[in-house]
């Protein structure tokens, strides 16, 4: 469902597959305008009904000649924000449709983007209330966290003639210069047994002077995070497209200061406006959320006007516009979206941040160049089928709210309303 494809690393995108008509119209429109490769073949179809051989025939390629297969199966099945249906949801099986194309095309590399929950998803999801620590029976093998990715990696490794090694990275787009806090899983596989490394973060501080920053043990200096102001501060739209809040919702949001959320409302208004959600123990940070220009934007959702996932402009009482979405995702300024308003928001909100796609594309391009220089000789030492690396993916801006005021802290539990850079570590956690 992303509508912008890797423009980096010297790749030519020769084919794309998309099910949704409006999304395909967006691709066609930008293709006709010369923003995409002139030889791009567009397949408007469900990937489960598409023959890999048909794709090869249309592009004039043979198995093994494709440098990179990139894609992202629907993520709702694995999202920690959803019901974690995993492969019990038919959409979860699209993971194996993706594997079908890998097996048929035999690309040198593949890149899969998904929600971070994919890395911990179970083949058979058991509700938390029924798990062993709640008195339930021990988990079966297919109920264990991570069983989806283990089986997928195992099946990848068994592909005849070119078993794939896969490196799984949990990253945050904000750490690479995107003006958005967006945690994602990036799966990079190759048929040469090469162990691929993802770059260390380049950004990591909400201050303007990198010279002042010594957060990491090696005292490497990071650039400041890109902020919402960097993304949309100069935007002046004459006729914006906006999926706006209702008058009732605007009444509550008008009481919330920039950078705050439901906690800034009087308690009686919290209860009135949130209903049963007010007594929930988690997942409430998006309720009546008003953004701030001074920090990166939270993760974009497909509908910014929901009460529980509000994306309200910092100073105007309205939802973010479509083009503000596009700026935050760093689409080119001349990019065009097609379809109904809801469909256009879905395209922008579901897309991989352009900057993150470029970083991943550059990583793969460098590996392809290195392998070409050694005549595509595979790595003689065979690594494990897969590994998972967490590259400082969980980022906190250290904001909290009390009695209608917004605070930041240096250490959790410190109630002083003073600003401090977040504590962060450079070391990657490997499993």
Describe these PLM feature segments:
Residues 72, 113, 169, 188:
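Alpha/beta-hydrolase-fold catalytic nucleophile elbow
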Residues 1-12, 155-161, 180, 184-347, ...:
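S-adenosyl-L-methionine-dependent DNA methyltransferase catalytic core
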Residues 116, 163-175:
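Conserved S-adenosyl-L-methionine
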Residues 144-160:
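Short alpha-helix
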Residues 76-80, 118-122, 177-181, 195-197, ...:
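Short catalytic/ligand-binding loop motif for oxyanion handling, primarily in non-cytosolic enzymes
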Residues 35-41, 162-164, 194:
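A short helix-to-beta-strand connector/capping loop
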Residues 1-109, 115-139, 157:
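Core alpha/beta nucleotide-donor-binding catalytic domains of modification enzymes
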Residues 53-55, 95-97, 169-174, 283-286:
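Short alpha-helical segments and helix-capping/turn motifs at coil-helix boundaries
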């Amino acid at each position: 469902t992303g509508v912008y494809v890797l423009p980096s690393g010297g790749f030519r995108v020769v084919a794309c597959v998309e099910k949704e008509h409006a999304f395909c119209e967006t691709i066609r429109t930008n293709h006709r305008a010369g923003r995409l490769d002139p030889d791009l073949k567009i397949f408007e179809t469900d990937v489960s009904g598409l023959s890999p051989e048909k794709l090869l025939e249309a592009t004039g390629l043979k198995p093994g000649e494709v440098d990179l297969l990139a894609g992202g199966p629907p993520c709702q099945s694995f999202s920690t924000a959803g019901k974690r249906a995993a492969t019990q949801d038919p959409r979860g099986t699209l993971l194996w449709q993706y594997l079908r194309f890998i097996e048929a095309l035999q690309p040198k590399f593949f890149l899969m983007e998904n929600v971070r929950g994919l890395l911990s998803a179970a083949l058979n999801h058991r509700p938390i209330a029924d798990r062993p620590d709640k008195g339930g029976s021990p988990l079966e093998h297919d109920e264990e966290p991570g069983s989806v990715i283990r089986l997928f990696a195992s099946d990848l490794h068994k592909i005849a003639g070119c078993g794939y090694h896969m490196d799984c990275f949990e990253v945050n787009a904000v750490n690479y210069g995107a003006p958005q806090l967006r945690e994602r899983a990036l799966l990079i596989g190759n048929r040469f047994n090469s162990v691929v490394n993802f770059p260390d973060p380049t950004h990591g501080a909400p201050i303007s002077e990198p010279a002042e920053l010594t957060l990491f043990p090696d005292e490497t200096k990071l650039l400041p995070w890109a902020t919402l102001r960097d993304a949309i501060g100069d935007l002046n739209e004459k006729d914006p497209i906006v999926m706006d809040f209702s008058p009732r919702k605007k009444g509550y949001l008008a009481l919330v200061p920039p950078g705050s959320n439901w906690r800034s409302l009087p308690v009686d208004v919290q209860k009135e406006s949130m209903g049963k959600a007010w007594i929930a123990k988690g997942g409430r940070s998006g309720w009546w959320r008003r953004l701030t220009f001074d920090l990166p934007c939270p993760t974009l959702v497909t509908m910014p006007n929901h009460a529980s996932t509000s994306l309200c402009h910092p100073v105007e009482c309205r939802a973010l516009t479509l083009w503000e979405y596009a700026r935050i995702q760093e689409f080119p300024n001349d990019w065009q979206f097609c379809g109904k308003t809801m469909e256009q928001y879905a395209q922008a909100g579901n897309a991989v941040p352009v900057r993150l796609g470029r970083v991943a594309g550059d990583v793969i391009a460098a590996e392809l160049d290195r392998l070409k220089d050694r005549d595509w000789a595979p790595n003689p030492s065979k690594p494990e089928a897969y590994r998972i690396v967490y590259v400082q993916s969980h980022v906190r801006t250290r904001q909290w709210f009390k009695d209608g005021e917004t605070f930041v802290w240096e250490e959790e539990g410190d109630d002083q309303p003073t600003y401090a850079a977040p504590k962060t570590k450079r070391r990657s956690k490997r499993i």
